[in-house]
């Protein structure tokens, strides 16, 4: 892979028209998410640096929210937000940074620790993708790339500095970052640092969300050596540190202690309470309502998350159609530390991942191949503090290892003068997980195929079939001890984890069809019109959920004294996606719609954590060509009444209106300056996203200034 300063700089030059900042790029091509450097590769969705600067999002999930059927899960704390893709999230969506997996996952806490200032672009693959990335890719893949010096240098400069200051009113967020970079014909180097500081978040109608303040700081260093035309090496190291004081369950609105739970229980059972006769909920409704509105017991804690990654890349790209080779060696380490504010009880979870990826592509006259081998080793260690008061009932600490080896093959077979393109792929994974006392091992084959039919020069049809799997995580395999518990006058009520030796991997079989219409010079010379429609059906077997088990010797909700990770057979996720865009030299109009429904095929019951349907419309207009652009987006989120029977909460509809403006001249006296302004939730709506335990951000004015020299 020969890197040209000119070509790489051009692809990331700040596009001042900003016409595509909020629109979905339907024909993005990149090798990061698809692992495919061939000319036939296709990345369905992409967010460029220009789009990220315009949005000024504070999390990866928020940056992707305008994509149909991609939503934010995890509440309003940015550190806990994760992308929900077609109803699946958390460890069912693979996260990739600079071509290597990020495997840290801890229930109700964050796993996306890369700050937006260090992201050059984001790619999204929607739908099962295990044939590319192995275990976990049931919902899709989110792949991020950090910048290098060649991204930031302009006009064949050899040295540069970029300074950015951002501010947001909803939480007084201050974002500072500085990058210094240089390059010549052989070497390129980049050093970046950032510091973010935020107060408590303001939600709709002026209310504050307690314990949402945070600090995050860190940096990135990259070095590249273009040895010759055929050989290049890169070395990068990234470190970030995140600090906050929040409930141990980062998705919960407030701290919820055992004492508070007991108080609510006593109030409910008190015969002298003032419930109107028809207003008092049933016993089951009461307990399910507590869980759905407040979450579980969660104590206020000081939290720190050091995260680091080191990656070595080697590229071999001789003038040989059989060789286009990439080798990556990497080491990731993430530590999640918590200390309870009142009792001082300490917890720690540490995950280290070491791995190697080897990939090669071969271009033959009538067929193209991409093939490779991945190996990674995860090592997790946990510490769980206890005492006789608030930490009496705790999960047991565990240490475990996991080894995964995967081999994959992707082929592209053009037929009938490339009118048809057949792209089959397959991946075989072997994995084992072990603790001191237990060992599991298994393997899985993940096939996929894609057929693209170019009917005319303005109409394409695509049909996909993808299979995916997710092996049980080490937490699902090895967690033991108490899930939660409390002491009462009649004794201890303890909910304990029960191991499940028969826990099976989740598997997914996805069917998908897409129609893509694209016209040039439709109404006037130089305009472009695109419309894309997709229907998918993802059948997920053995979906793993934590299930509370009844005690056969007792009655009522209080008898739920065990929790066990179990497989739910025959879950079905289906939905549609529509997106359209019309673009002229100055004007861009766009709309998109996404809807996902999920149910258990056996019981017919709705699945949890399925985002509400949404439709968005917007426009961008260059008031001053190549200099100043304004835009607006209106998004309607439908009511979500499809919830599990024991969820006890439904969610009303709401509409959000966002405005934006960008000043970024390509030439002239101020060509090195870029200003972005955004006003989100213009009318300060009070709203709560489906399945979130807290309300969303209120009116938020954002401003960002970037200066390069």
From Swiss-Prot:
It comes from the Bacteria. Its main location: membrane. It is found in: Cell outer membrane. It is a multi-pass membrane protein. PROSITE patterns: TONB_DEPENDENT_REC_2 (PS01156), TONB_DEPENDENT_REC_3 (PS52016). GO terms for cellular component: cell outer membrane. Residues 1-21 form the signal peptide. Residues 36-147 form the TBDR plug domain. SUPFAM superfamilies: Porins (SSF56935). The keyword Transmembrane applies. Keywords: Cell outer membrane, Membrane, Signal, TonB box, Transmembrane, Transmembrane beta strand, Transport. Residues 158-709 form the TBDR beta-barrel domain. GO terms for molecular function: heme transmembrane transporter activity; siderophore uptake transmembrane transporter activity. Coiled coil: none annotated. InterPro entries: Plug_dom, Plug_dom_sf, TonB-dep_rcpt-like, TonB-dep_rcpt_b-brl, TonB_haem/Hb_rcpt, TonB_Hb/transfer/lactofer_rcpt, TonB_rcpt_b-brl_sf, TonB_rcpt_CS. A motif (TonB C-terminal box) lies at residues 692-709. It holds the Pfam family Plug. Disulfide bonds: none annotated. Required for utilization of free heme at low concentrations. Belongs to the TonB-dependent receptor family. This is Heme/hemopexin utilization protein C. It comes from Haemophilus influenzae (strain 86-028NP). The lineage of its organism: Bacteria, Pseudomonadati, Pseudomonadota, Gammaproteobacteria, Pasteurellales.
